[in-house]
Design a protein with these regions (language model features):
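Loop/helix-junction capping segments adjacent to catalytic residues or to phosphate/diphosphate-binding pockets
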Residues: 20, 49-53, 76
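Glycine-rich, highly charged phosphate/nucleotide-binding loops
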Residues: 18-31
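Ordered, amphipathic secondary-structure segments that act as subunit-interaction surfaces
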Residues: 31-58, 63-71
């Protein structure tokens, strides 16, 4: 979706539940798009598919664009949950998670709070972009449309 909110394409991908391939899956989707006009990447959630951690810094460095990971609620962290679900291999997941750093709380012009991790842009630039892309509520339009499409595909019976 472009910043003028025109939908101009989709790409689909997947990552392994409980795996370590979310970052590579996102990079693969970016490459499949083959679009030179992309100017930023938004990701809804940085820890997806049962603790499959997205490395926003690596993605930003590889594609040379700003990457903004968006979450909608404050949390106390997931360290204990990672230890619980991965008792024999939690060290590597915790190391990957700690590399993400802390989230920044921002308030949109809609008065909703978001929590972001940003690479390749400042918090101020990320806030400006998210304000522009959020028409109502807390979910920026590109992420809202992506979630609608994903939910529809999950429910579809071909």
């Amino acid at each position: 979706m472009s910043t003028d909110l025109i939908i101009d394409g989709f790409v689909l991908g997947h990552s392994t539940v409980g795996g370590d391939d979310a970052t590579e899956a996102i990079l693969s989707m970016y490459e499949k798009l083959d679009r030179p006009d992309i100017s930023f990447l938004l990701i809804s959630g940085i820890v997806i598919s049962l603790y499959n951690i997205v490395d926003v810094k690596k993605i930003s460095e590889k594609i040379g664009l700003p990457v903004i990971g968006v979450t909608y609620e404050d949390s106390k962290g997931i360290e204990d949950a990672i230890k619980h679900h991965f008792p024999k291999s939690y060290d590597s997941k915790l190391a990957e998670y700690s590399k993400l750093g802390t989230r920044e709380k921002i308030t949109l012009r809609t008065s909703y709070d978001l929590y972001i991790r940003n690479e390749g842009c400042t918090v101020s630039e990320a806030t400006h972009l998210l304000d522009k892309l959020t028409l109502q509520g807390s979910v920026p339009e590109p992420l809202r449309i992506s979630q609608l499409l994903a939910n529809t595909l999950l429910k579809a019976k071909f």
